Swiss-Prot record:
Cofactor(s) needed: Zn(2+)
Annotated Zn(2+) 2 binding sites: E145, D179, H216, E261
SMART domains xref list: AP2Ec (SM00518)
Name of the protein: Probable endonuclease 4
One Pfam family this sequence matches: AP_endonuc_2
Residues given in the record as Zn(2+) 3 binding sites: H182, D229, H231
Native source organism of the sequence: Aeromonas salmonicida (strain A449)
Function: Endonuclease IV plays a role in DNA repair. It cleaves phosphodiester bonds at apurinic or apyrimidinic (AP) sites, generating a 3'-hydroxyl group and a 5'-terminal sugar phosphate.
Lineage: superkingdom: Bacteria
Length: 281
């Protein structure tokens, strides 16, 4: 089964995300468990945790249908020891929040070398940061997102992702979230059925489909290979529709959250319905 949804607002409490997902016809969703643009946040209240779990149970959302995202401030490959320590502490806090909510994934951008250390050294720091956090937690899988490669961001190439996974000691608790817009911006051509098949064959060969835990389903305002991160609605922009047809008709994308981060939330319900319509009977 395809689990399709969007990154919904947690305004007013994480327990409110479930109703927002249901309102757009979703059977998957993403959320922030805290303000994504602040380092510190109040702990989740027991009341919020109970309400979230109860709402998920009533609506039929299991942990594998939900893809929490961490703060944009965190940089697990930070070249400065103080910045790295701050990022690691914040990342562990995010994992602990997922633990409290009974969730099994935490999606995150790997980090950036900031032009201060070699790329390879920063990739090693990211893997070491993941190991550090996993040793201090349980039950939550660290889900690395491929990036557009904007600036000095790591994780834009399949080789980067494979290197990061290779450095993680507990392979059962690491995975990948594949973002269609980011891949396109990074130079992976998803515009035709043939090129889609090739990209996903390369992904399987270099990274491995066994590590795919979720996807971000996005159109692209950016141009191909531009290394610029600019999302668009699914049927607008430069990416085209071939990749969405491919995803909806390939059972390797079953059973994982397929999450919209498209730019017009007023049409998320329509986009979800359209994606479902692409599946061949």
């Amino acid at each position: 089964m395809k689990y399709i949804g969007a990154h919904v607002s947690a305004a007013g409490g994480v327990e409110n995300t479930i109703a927002r997902a249901q309102a757009i016809g979703a059977n998957a969703f993403a959320l922030f468990t805290k303000n994504q643009r602040q380092w510190q946040a109040a702990p989740l209240s027991e009341a919020s945790i109970r309400a979230f779990k109860l709402a998920c149970e009533k609506a039929g959302f299991r942990p594998e249908q939900i893809l929490p995202h961490d703060s944009y401030l965190i940089n697990l490959g930070h070249p400065d020891p103080d910045g790295l320590a701050k990022s690691r502490d914040a990342f562990l806090d995010e994992i602990k929040r997922c633990e409290q909510l009974g969730l099994c994934y935490l999606n995150f951008h790997p980090g950036s070398h900031l032009k201060q250390i070699p790329e390879a050294a920063s990739l090693t720091l990211v893997s070491e940061s993941i190991n550090w956090a996993l040793e201090r937690s349980q039950g939550v899988t660290a889900v690395i997102e491929n990036t557009a490669g904007q600036g000095t961001n790591l994780g834009w190439s399949f080789e980067h992702l494979a290197t990061l996974i290779d450095g993680v000691e507990d392979k059962s608790r690491v995975g990948i979230c594949f973002d269609t817009c980011h891949a396109f911006a990074a130079g992976y051509d998803l515009r035709t059925p043939e090129s889609c098949a090739q990209v996903f064959a390369d992904f399987d060969r270099i990274v491995g489909f066994q590590y795919l835990k979720g996807m971000h389903i996005n159109g692209a305002k950016c141009t191909f290979g531009s290394r610029v991160d600019r999302h668009h609605s699914l049927r607008e922009g430069n990416l085209g529709e071939a990749v969405f047809h491919h995803i909806m008709n390939d059972d390797r994308f079953d059973g994982i959250p397929l999450v919209l981060e498209t730019i017009d939330e007023t049409i998320w319900g329509d986009e979800i319905s359209w994606l479902r319509s692409l599946a061949k009977a």
